[in-house]
Amino acid sequence: CTYAENFLHILGAEKITPLMTRIMDATLVLHGEHTINASTFTAMVTSSTLANASQVVASAIGSLSGPLHGGANEKVIAMLQKIESKEEIRPWLDETLKAKNVVWGMGHREYSVKDPRANILTDMVQELFEEREGGVTDIFEKAIELEKACEEKLSHKGVYPNVDFYSGILYKEMDIPTDIFTPIFAMSRVSGWLAHWIEQIQDNKIFRPTQNYVGSDDRAYICLLYTSPSPRDGQI
């Protein structure tokens, strides 16, 4: 029993096929490491203080908890579920772009082309549907249509699907609860975080960036006693 297969058993999957195991294993590998993102950088900074491995992972998870880093594949699913049909994709995209709202799962700071990890996951989604012989689902059809529409409107800006766009669909089709998506990401990224921990402590120098102050030169000190409301005044 592999690590990926055992995890699917723990989640309570009723029928685990070799393809499902391969997909889970592939997603863990694809998410294992991907340059210096926020959580990895946090892990590196914590490592530089000579904190132990558990503390390094804990700090990275803290960074991952922020909405701008983790949870994008969960938001992709919620976004696609709100769109009634694939025919509504283009009108929805026009309204979203006009309002300058986020199209979740689109664009990546490191790529001006489709995320290579997303290409692998797209093929795996199709393999999963072929194995089940039930045709593609409504949510996958909407995802394909949205990718086409975004390519027409956003490719000139280098905006294409990233790894989160299809990973959530894969997990959903394997009946994995949405609120487990980000913990799965953390589970896979632990290997990358700890690889950076090992690398850091082998030739360590504590992170200490220089900060240039650009405020006023002289400022008056104001005692907080005279600026904060007193609890006894009932003004908390």
Where are the regions a protein language model picked out?
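Accessory "access/gating" subregions that flank catalytic or transport cores
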Residues: C1-Q55, S63, A78-G158
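Conserved phosphate/anionic-ligand binding catalytic regions in large, soluble enzymes, centered on
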Residues: T49-I77, V103-S112, Y160-H196
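Short alpha-helical linear motifs
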Residues: S65-L68, K100-V103, N204-N212
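Short, well-ordered loop/turn and helix-capping segments at boundaries between secondary-structure elements
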Residues: A78-K86, E127-E131, I176, A186, ...
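Short glycine/threonine-rich loop-to-helix capping motif typified by GTGT followed
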Residues: R117, K172, I176-P177, R219-I222
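C-terminal auxiliary extensions adjacent to catalytic cores
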Residues: I201-L225
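Conserved small/polar residues in nucleotide/adenosyl-binding loops
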Residues: Y226-P231, Q235
